[in-house]
A protein has these predicted regions:
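Gly/Pro-rich turn-and-neighbor structural signature
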Residues: 249, 253-284
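Catalytic-core signal marking the mid-to-C-terminal active-site face
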Residues: 2-18, 27-30, 262, 269-270, ...
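A generic structural motif
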Residues: 49-51, 135-141, 210, 250-256, ...
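Core alpha/beta catalytic barrel or barrel-like domain that forms the active/cofactor pocket
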Residues: 165-173, 190-208, 228-248, 277-297, ...
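Alpha-helix capping and helix-loop boundary segments enriched in small/acidic/polar residues
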Residues: 208-212, 234, 251-258, 282-289, ...
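ATP/Mg2+-dependent ligation/transfer catalytic cores
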Residues: 2-234, 256-259, 426
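Broad gene-expression machinery/nucleic-acid interaction feature
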Residues: 42, 127-131, 167-171, 243-245, ...
């Protein structure tokens, strides 16, 4: 059936191009019912750009059902932005700077909702939210869409018999917003940074008194995160002034990256509505500040046995052979992967010796001074690797994809002497 015939038959964009699974079609029906049952008025359609920033449009609820299947048009310049939100490719030249006719002339692409991601936003009255994948009008996936790239990596990993399991440990700064800097003279490109003050003085790591001091600030955040259905685990007062940490239970595959995208965006929006400013910038330019990191806890699930593939057989080894080879791959590819684990210049300010942040490519068993911290013992089902290299501003899809590619390269090409069996005894 030609595209013209498909249009004539009344098929929508999703149906014409076979974009949804049966589970997604079922989820779409549930979304429609939920919109009506909850009397939602607005639905936000969002996608994660190259930097892991959510962009999108808000539509009235009565249009959401149709647009889930037909798509929401967006300008392709959104795929050509730097971190200051400037378009940095010549989009009005042949190929649009990408060598692709689809990117010429600031033309449109389409956001297609993933109905399984639907949430009702607790902080925005009568508003739903959908995370989207992005396609060109001809039905082809945007080849550099980071969520799709990560999904492809996960599919390749699945073909090898594994799924990726990740736990999020994310540091951030939460400030009082003293001056949002909205005067006309402040509205430069990029805009002037806000004036802020701290919510705690720092240097009292994990004290209960300091935790209680900031509890009134953190309560609306953790309550909202729980209401969103994210697997929230703990909140902690960190070492630096106005620095905090949230952790999440392990998640598999796409769920972990999607959770980080939603968490980060939610925190910023909730903060602004409460007169606060939340930033995942690694090292804000303020006196006495401490750098924030994003530690990515990771392991592989054996799809046949449903067991943790990093667990040793109990013969005195902390990691299985596969786990050792995966670790060796993380180490061998760490420099290349840094483009995705630490994508900003600011992130490199964190790499200092004796600063609880890695400044060299090394591993250790339960050692917070190394890049990759091996957690667990022989036969321990929760055995995993904690890569401490990342910054909180990293694109989750690219960060996690880089870990899988790096680790599985180590599995495919075992490196003798990189991580020897004798060095990993439990």
């Amino acid at each position: 059936m030609s595209s013209h015939d498909q249009r004539a038959s009344g098929m929508n964009f999703v149906e014409r191009h076979g974009l949804w699974s049966s589970d997604q079609f079922k989820a779409a029906e549930s979304v429609e019912q939920e919109i009506q049952a909850q009397k939602l008025e607005l639905v936000r359609f969002s996608f994660a750009d190259q930097h892991g920033v959510l962009r999108g449009k808000t539509v009235v609820a009565s249009e959401a059902t149709k647009l889930m299947r037909s798509g929401v048009a967006m300008t392709s310049t959104l795929l050509a932005k730097d971190t200051s939100h400037r378009t940095v490719f010549p989009v009005f030249t042949p190929g649009g700077g990408f060598g692709m006719p689809e990117m010429e002339g600031a033309s449109d692409f389409l956001m297609i909702a993933d109905p399984t991601t639907f949430r009702i936003l607790p902080w925005a009255p009568n508003t739903g939210w959908l995370l989207c994948d992005i396609y060109f009008p001809n039905g082809k996936p945007v080849p550099f869409a980071t969520r799709q790239l990560y999904r492809n990596i996960l599919a390749s990993l699945s073909d090898r018999g594994f799924d990726f399991v990740a736990g999020l440990e994310v540091e951030f700064h939460l400030f009082k917003l003293e001056n949002a800097r909205l005067a006309p003279s402040d509205c430069t490109w990029p805009g002037e940074p806000p004036e802020v003050s701290f919510i705690h003085q720092g240097f009292q790591l994990l004290t209960e008194a300091r935790s209680d001091q900031i509890d009134p600030f953190l309560e609306p955040f953790w309550r909202t995160i729980v209401a969103l259905g994210l697997p929230f685990r703990s909140m902690e007062v960190e070492l630096g002034p106005s620095q905090c940490e949230f952790t999440f239970r392990p998640m598999s595959g796409l769920q972990a990256a999607d959770a980080m995208i939603l968490f980060r965006s939610a925190m910023k929006q909730i903060a602004r509505r409460h007169g606060l400013h939340c930033t995942f910038m690694c090292r804000p330019g303020l006196p006495n500040i401490f750098s924030s990191g994003w530690h990515l806890h990771q392991s592989l699930l054996d799809l046949k046995t449903k067991a943790n593939a990093f667990v040793s057989d109990g013969a005195g080894q902390v990691l299985s052979d596969l786990g050792r080879f995966y670790l060796a791959g993380l180490l061998a590819n760490a420099r290349a992967a840094a483009a995705f684990t630490t994508p900003t210049l600011n992130g490199y300010k964190r790499y200092r010796p004796y600063a609880l942040a890695p400044d060299r490519v090394i591993w250790g068993q339960d050692n917070r001074g190394v890049m990759v911290r091996v957690m667990g013992r022989a036969g321990e089902p929760t055995t995993h690797l904690e890569n401490r290299v990342g910054e909180p501003a990293a694109n989750p899809y690219l960060y996690m994809a880089s870990q899988i590619i790096s680790g599985m390269d180590g599995v495919a090409r075992p490196r003798s002497g990189c991580v020897g069996r004798h060095a990993l005894r439990g």
